[in-house]
């Protein structure tokens, strides 16, 4: 979690002010006694798919400008259910299936301190957040109740971005750090007290000269500034310790996670061959940094990540969940290909990303739009341009404002994602009346309309509402009519329609050419022929022909510069082509030394 840009000499003063501010903000929060949020869900119980960003009740921040945030997630499974802790959420989230989420409120935890860490040990959950020593460690055996007790009242380490790791032998370790100067650290803790034992070690620091993903900027284009290295997380797999970290900064589309590997929990750590492991620089919602890796009830690995909007404020962020794998050689990778399209939530052990694919394609990209009204700086086309950082806004938030998309072909519609944006909002924190009400309809002729989803009586906060249709419909037009917004205008960062259009998938793309920059080998330039009928392209690349784990989506264009390579690594590239009917995989793989 990137707090601010401070030289080392001001760190102590910063931490003191950070804590004072946290205490002040806590006094502003008026939450009920530690109970589930009493909002009635209207989500269909038959839902089996999801789409990023996760459709959580993201809390409005307590200071201006009015905006929502959640970041620095920590997910764990406790007694077969999921608990998700994230910065500035006014509580923590609970789910039985990773599809439907409830908010648990509590007065017992320091919810205004950034980057919460939570771990299960001996039948209890332990919690701590960033801050200045002495810090408190909290414990509960009943997280659903929201009741926590202080377990350790004087944890002695001042730090940001804590991470607890319990080894298979029961020993407890602590990783931390968030700096554009200092390294990440690790130390062993006494599992009976959570106090440090042994000697602190430095585990890694930036080498942005040769690791392009550590360079700042949306496209890793800024070399001169040191990155923020932060967000430690450790996973043990087949006897190896995978130390994950994030950089170069939470506000960038390039925000990602990379990994070092060791034979012991305190290292020494060596950079893994495949990096970054979690990377999503393009698409509707981007970045996949400051994450944690966990296993679901079936043994599948997942990576829950911070994703950027960062328009009203640098810390305007959302969360995404991505499937994660370890291959036969122990190489770890997070699958972010089509990472904001719908995917299946498994109910069994899986072995590849292909098992989660729905086959539903994006039908709404850059399609003709009609609206009831629009603001000059937020025109209607921004509802379908696949960019969460821009938005269409009606002139008001009144009942009856509407938007309609012409898909241009009568297509099979399987799902719709409604991504609201908080335009002209004044809301702060949590409170009554924070929910959306709407009517979603479809038509084949723009005259006769039928209901897709009726949420005119909804009282659930659904800022990124995802509607999976139990029975697909044939539609050419999709219309969304506003009945209520919490505050401000009726505004959408994206009205996204998924399914399949008639026709065939595009042909393979030809003449992929790749040129590596020998003066700065973290960079590579790609060009290819535009393919008729293609919506976009997916560049897959990696460290071997059978390890093309990276995914870079391109819409419309036929050229790309990637600046996130390891200067010392050989790479292999191919290109897939997609449209509203399907994906055509590239078969020619090009080696780049």
Residue ranges with predicted function:
Residues 39-224, 236-283, 298, 306-351:
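Beta-rich carbohydrate-recognition and catalytic domains
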Residues 387-453, 463-510, 518-519, 529, ...:
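Aromatic, loop-rich ligand-recognition surfaces of beta-strand-rich domains
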Residues 435, 531-548:
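Solvent-exposed loop/turn segments flanking beta-strands in beta-repeat/beta-sandwich domains
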Residues 456-459, 551-557:
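Short beta-strand segments within Ig-like beta-sandwich modules, predominantly Fibronectin type-III
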Residues 522-534:
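Conserved aromatic anchor
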Residues 562-583:
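Beta-strand-rich modules
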Residues 579-593:
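Extracellular fibronectin type III
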